[in-house]
């Protein structure tokens, strides 16, 4: 589907603030989306038998096997939105399992003769949406990991983090912080306006933070 959005939802709470912010982003993008709720998936256990089967399927070129359904789905998306709350310096474990499932040679990337990953994905934009109760949110284990994988393997040039933090600090007005984060989405280009060549993509991803917007977001 043209202008398709893949929405990868790693949230688990019914009143998830991350999910709330992600839904506002989807409204802003203004295109149909397909949602994956990671809590509803049963990821296979990674053991020797699983790895042997996976390697056998890949070596024989059986990329249509159900084991690679998630990878094929990801490779077809033109825009990706990942909603992942900030947990323990990173993100929920289910997201790591998902990323392992979609990182498949011959589907989402291939290796060049020099051993360099080359993208097989269609996506040009990926949004990583997250919220945090505190302010100490180092990005290298969460967004930084997703960014490196998205750009280095999947060839997605435009990777942005959309966040709201400090929500649970003493005296914080969580609703005001959320509202500011939602209002800041006005600077995101809707899908209909994001035509190829309309805006140059940098290999260094843009990072949408409170510093860029002038207010604290989550």
Show which residues each predicted segment covers.
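Hydrophobic residues at beta-strand termini and immediately following loops
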Residues: 36, 129, 162
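Short, well-ordered alpha-helical segments in soluble proteins
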Residues: 99-102, 106, 130, 154
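Conserved nucleotide-sugar donor-interacting segment of glycosyltransferase catalytic cores
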Residues: 104-114
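Short, glycine-/small-residue-rich phosphate/pyrophosphate-handling segment
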Residues: 112-154
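Short acidic/glycine-rich loop or secondary-structure boundary segments that cap or lie
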Residues: 44, 90-91, 136-138, 170
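N-terminal beta1-alpha1-beta2 submodule of the flavodoxin-like/Rossmannoid cofactor-binding fold
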Residues: 1-104, 183-218
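Glycine-rich phosphate/pyrophosphate-binding loop and the adjoining helix
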Residues: 137, 144-218
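Short histidine/acidic/glycine/proline-rich micro-motifs that form metal-
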Residues: 11-14, 133-137, 167-168
């Amino acid at each position: 589907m043209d202008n398709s959005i893949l929405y990868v939802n790693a949230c688990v709470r019914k009143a998830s603030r991350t999910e709330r912010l992600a839904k506002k982003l989807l409204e802003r993008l203004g295109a149909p989306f397909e949602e994956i709720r990671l809590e509803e998936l049963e990821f296979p256990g990674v053991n020797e038998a699983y790895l042997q089967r996976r390697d056998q399927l890949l070596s024989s070129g059986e990329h249509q096997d159900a084991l690679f359904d998630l990878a094929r789905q990801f490779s077809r998306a033109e825009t990706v939105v990942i909603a992942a709350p900030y947990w323990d310096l990173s993100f929920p474990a289910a997201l790591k399992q998902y990323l392992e499932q979609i990182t498949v040679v011959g589907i989402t990337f291939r290796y060049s003769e020099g051993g360099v990953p080359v993208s097989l994905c269609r996506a040009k934009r990926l949004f990583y949406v997250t919220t945090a109760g505190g302010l100490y949110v180092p990005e290298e284990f969460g967004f930084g990991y997703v960014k490196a994988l998205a750009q280095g393997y999947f060839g997605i040039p435009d990777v942005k983090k959309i966040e709201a933090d400090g929500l649970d600090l003493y005296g914080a007005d969580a609703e005001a912080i959320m509202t500011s984060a939602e209002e800041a989405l006005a600077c995101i280009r809707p899908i209909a306006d994001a035509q190829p060549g309309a805006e140059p993509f940098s290999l260094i991803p843009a990072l949408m933070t409170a510093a860029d917007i002038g207010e604290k977001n989550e």
